[in-house]
């Protein structure tokens, strides 16, 4: 109550932010009279002037009014589009590193040019991030005309480009691309062996278009580069063949809210019987239990044409939020293989992680981050907590006149769909275009069949018809057009009204259910009523919808029964609307908790990744790593001396045989120490004794190999050992995370346990790196002078081939999966035939050189 009164007196926080910006907008407008009379050459010269002023120490903040005025005039001359005042406000919000919520049709793409131009003047690079290649290419080429005019370099990153093209694109002042391409390029760069091969040049400023889709919806999806694990796929088919025996409630239970399925005791017993196992819960049977659980998920939780489609003998994931297919993406942890077995298509090998990062941690690397979307306010708390981004609601240039009608609720789905088709037919008869929003492919096809029977012409846009997406959406505002779109497919493309449609009432939105998130519902509504156009929307619901069935109250159904309502009789009631909104809030809160929880775990992994990648970068950047090698040697020597000296005993009784054996393992040396040498010595003396032997061995080796060759060998071995052990460490971390939840049963905090054990694993990784690098270095021999060059040349050639193969396999477009099923990109397996054509296994051929 008091909060509402204060808001009335002082205005909301959003109002205060906008009020602070207005004087800046006035200054930009005042400069128009100075900028407008300039000739083209004088306007272009402003870019050079701005760069010189920055070089002399002037800040971007000081340049903002004049640079915005220059960009506005340039856009007007080149594109014939002048930035509105609200777009100036949006540009200022973005420059300040905030999220601008701008309604559909308000010109987000044009707005972004203002901060992009200003920040591009610094020469440090600006990344404009979009959700798919089509939008990246479209926006880059469209706005690139203005950047060209002003003398700014720009480029785009799209799927299929090679490293030379990517390096050139990142070197530009302004780079457009998708979140996937930026993220995968970061991972690929950190798998390379030369700094000159890196594509990216830093993380200065990023503007994320459709920021809610990328930073919220896809936050649960790590980007992963992976290689095939060395295991058979036969077990997937064997497990799949017995799944028909398992019955719900008797053998397994389903929690639809948590989206989990669990075996009962009877289910475990049935599994033991069918798989001929004595104890399915025994550690020796852990693989069979894991496969059985994944097969249950595949059969019970994942639906064909909802969660995935089968296309050309492949299981292809369907994005939950956009309805787009994600070619090349695979669920992890054996789930994708279980789906392949379920659908009776070829079961591919499982994957092992080689490099991974979440979008949350990737985008937090930028010095400044900003975003644009039509729907962010419902997730403002999450943006602030996770990314420290404030959301500012932008006023529309024209008043919003769309009519959002009350929800209509039916007892069952059949009645709901009949009502939907009736409304579409009525609107079509009037000539009004209709956009029908569905949550899955099967619903879109059901509505399409019903419309065909009703003789209403229509277009269907879902994962099966994604190729014509932009074309279908662009035409959706024409007279009498009916378009069925799954999960906001076509987002990013404006629906412009055809001739005469405004007079008919504009675009009408019909939604066949509510999404779990209010934000997705608002996105669908926002397709109508752009830039002051008329329009309307209505949501059709039934008590059988998943949202109401799983999260809603059973009281709603009871009320409808007591009222004696007929099947085709709808109800509109405030209590039901509140129940729906409460259900959505529950789901949003639940999903936020999941993302926050996952980030807490990923932050542990992220710290380790930063350390390894930074050390790797320093090795690549330095010509000489001998100081690091010497430090490793000193640590190993110190540990050896500590292990084999025991000052409670006479030094002659120490384990000298064990010490000599370990010296042979670690340094490939076998000193012959006399009894006199071993008499009455202490820890420090043993340490110096070992250090002397090792130093002598190292000097001899350096003399034999030559100093330059030795430095080259040190770098090669250090990088190869780090990369190999990092891959194994990622696998260990995957196993740790998978089982850590069980610690809760032992009254321990799983997150604290994960942090503790992850720290131990990382410590072990660092020690193993030291021992393997030093051991390998002490054993290597150069027979011919050009051996190292030949080894380096072969390694570089093979590495380039692998990176090209990874590049070719990285999928284009959008990406999103459940949080436990990341995206993968394949790499050569150790046991697969070597790509050089020798006929040998990869690990026995070119793999040895890596």
From Swiss-Prot:
Task of the protein: Part of the Sec protein translocase complex. Interacts with the SecYEG preprotein conducting channel. Has a central role in coupling the hydrolysis of ATP to the transfer of proteins into and across the cell membrane, serving as an ATP-driven molecular motor driving the stepwise translocation of polypeptide chains across the membrane.
Keywords: ATP-binding, Cell inner membrane, Cell membrane, Cytoplasm, Membrane, Metal-binding, Nucleotide-binding, Protein transport, Translocase, Translocation, Transport, Zinc
Binding site for Zn(2+): 834, 836, 845-846
CDD domains found in the cross-reference section: DEXDc_SecA, SF2_C_secA
Subcellular location: Cell inner membrane; Cytoplasm
Note on cofactor: May bind 1 zinc ion per subunit.
A Gene Ontology term for the protein's cellular component: plasma membrane
Binding site for ATP: 87, 105-109, 494
Keyword Nucleus in record: no
Record-given protein name: Protein translocase subunit SecA
EC nos: 7.4.2.8
Entries under NCBIfam families matching the protein: PRK09200.1 (NF006630), PRK12904.1 (NF009538), secA (TIGR00963)
GO molecular function: ATP binding; metal ion binding; protein-exporting ATPase activity
InterPro entries found in the cross-reference section: Helicase_ATP-bd, Helicase_C-like, P-loop_NTPase, SEC_C_motif, SecA, SecA_CS, SecA_DEAD, SecA_motor_DEAD
A Pfam family of this chain: SecA_SW
Family note: Belongs to the SecA family.
Matching Gene3D superfamilies: Helical scaffold and wing domains of SecA, P-loop containing nucleotide triphosphate hydrolases, SecA, preprotein cross-linking domain
GO biological-process terms attached to the record: intracellular protein transmembrane transport; protein import; protein targeting; protein transport by the Sec complex
Encoding gene, per UniProt annotation: secA
Catalytic activity: ATP + H2O + cellular proteinSide 1 = ADP + phosphate + cellular proteinSide 2
HAMAP family according to UniProt: SecA
């Amino acid at each position: 109550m008091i909060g509402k009164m204060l808001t009335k007196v002082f205005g909301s926080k959003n109002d205060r932010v906008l009020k602070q910006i207005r004087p800046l907008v006035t200054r930009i407008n005042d400069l128009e009279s100075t900028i407008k009379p300039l000739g083209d050459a004088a306007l272009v010269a402003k870019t050079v002037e701005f760069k010189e002023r920055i070089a002399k120490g002037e800040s971007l903040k000081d340049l903002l009014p004049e640079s915005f005025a220059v960009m506005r005039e340039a856009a007007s001359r080149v594109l014939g589009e002048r930035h509105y005042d609200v777009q100036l406000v949006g540009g200022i919000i973005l420059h300040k590193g905030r999220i601008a919520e701008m309604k559909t049709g308000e010109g987000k793409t044009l707005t972004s040019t203002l901060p992009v131009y200003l920040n591009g003047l610094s020469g440090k690079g600006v990344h404009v991030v979009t959700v798919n290649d089509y939008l990246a290419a479209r926006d880059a080429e469209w706005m690139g005309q203005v950047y060209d005019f002003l003398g700014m370099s720009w480029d785009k990153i799209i799927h299929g480009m090679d490293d030379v093209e990517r390096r050139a694109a990142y070197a530009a002042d302004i780079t457009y691309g998708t979140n996937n391409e930026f993220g995968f390029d970061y991972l690929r760069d950190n798998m390379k062996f030369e700094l000159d091969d890196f594509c990216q040049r830093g993380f200065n400023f990023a503007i994320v278009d459709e920021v809610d889709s990328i930073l919220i919806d896809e936050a649960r999806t790590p980007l992963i580069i992976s290689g095939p694990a060395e295991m058979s796929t036969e077990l997937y088919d064997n497990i799949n063949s017995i799944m028909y025996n398992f019955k719900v409630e008797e053998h397994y239970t389903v929690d639809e809210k948590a989206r989990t399925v669990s075996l009962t005791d009877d289910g475990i017993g049935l599994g033991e019987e069918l798989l001929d196992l004595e104890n399915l819960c025994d550690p020796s049977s852990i693989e069979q239990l894991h496969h059985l659980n994944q097969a249950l998920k595949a059969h019970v939780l994942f639906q064909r044409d909802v969660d995935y489609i089968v296309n050309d003998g492949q299981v292809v994931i369907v994005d939950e939020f956009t309805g787009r297919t994600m070619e090349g993406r695979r669920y992890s942890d054996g789930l994708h293989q279980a789906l392949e077995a379920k659908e009776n298509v070829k079961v591919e090998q499982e994957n092992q992680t080689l490099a991974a990062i979440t979008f949350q941690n990737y985008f937090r690397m930028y010095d400044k981050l900003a975003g644009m979307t039509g729907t962010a306010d419902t997730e403002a708390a999450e943006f602030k907590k996770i990314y420290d981004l404030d959301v500012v609601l932008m006023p529309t240039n024209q008043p919003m006149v769309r009519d959002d009608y009350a929800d209509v609720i039916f007892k069952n789905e059949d009645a709901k769909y009949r009502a939907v088709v009736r409304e579409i037919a009525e609107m079509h008869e009037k000539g009004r275009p209709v956009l029908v929003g569905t949550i899955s492919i099967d619903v879109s096809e059901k509505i399409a069949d019903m419309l065909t029977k009703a003789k209403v012409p229509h277009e269907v846009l879902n994962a099966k018809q994604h190729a014509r997406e932009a074309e279908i959406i662009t035409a959706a505002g024409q007279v009498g057009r009916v378009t069925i779109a799954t999960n906001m497919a076509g987002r990013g493309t404006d629906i412009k009204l055809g001739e005469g449609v405004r007079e008919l009432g504009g675009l009408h939105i019909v939604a066949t259910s509510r999404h779990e998130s209010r934000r997705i519902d608002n996105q669908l509504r926002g397709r109508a009523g752009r830039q002051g156009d008329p329009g309307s929307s209505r949501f059709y619901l039934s008590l059988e919808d998943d949202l109401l069935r799983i999260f809603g109250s059973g009281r709603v159904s009871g009320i409808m029964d007591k009222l004696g309502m007929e099947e085709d009789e709808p109800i509109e009631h405030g209590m039901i609307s509140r129940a729906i909104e409460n259900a959505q809030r529950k789901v949003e809160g639940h999903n936020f908790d999941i993302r926050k929880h996952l980030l807490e775990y990923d932050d542990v992994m992220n710290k380790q990744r930063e350390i390894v990648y930074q050390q790797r970068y320093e090795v690549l950047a330095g010509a000489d790593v001998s100081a690091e090698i010497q430090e490793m040697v000193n640590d190993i020597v110190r540990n050896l001396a500590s292990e084999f000296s025991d000052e409670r005993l006479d030094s002659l009784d120490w384990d000298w045989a064990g010490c000599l054996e370990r010296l042979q393992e670690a340094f490939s040396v076998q000193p012959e120490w006399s009894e006199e040498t071993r008499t009455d010595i202490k820890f420090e003396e043993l340490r110096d004794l070992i250090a002397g032997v090792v130093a002598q061995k190292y000097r001899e080796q350096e003399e034999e190999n030559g100093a330059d060759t030795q430095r080259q060998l040190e770098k090669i071995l250090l990088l190869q050992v780090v990369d190999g052990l990092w891959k194994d460490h990622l696998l260990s971390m995957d196993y740790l995370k998978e089982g850590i939840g069980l610690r809760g049963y032992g009254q321990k905090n799983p997150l604290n346990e994960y942090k503790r054990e992850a720290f131990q694993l990382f410590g072990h990784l660092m020690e193993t790196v030291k021992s393997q690098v030093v051991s390998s270095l002490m054993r290597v021999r150069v027979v011919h002078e050009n051996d190292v060059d030949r080894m380096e040349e072969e390694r570089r050639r093979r590495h380039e081939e692998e990176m090209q193969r990874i590049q070719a396999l990285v999928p284009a477009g959008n990406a999103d999966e459940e949080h436990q099923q990341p995206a993968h990109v394949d790499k050569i397996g150790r046991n697969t035939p070597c790509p050089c054509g020798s006929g040998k296994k990869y690990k026995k051929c070119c793999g040895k050189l890596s």
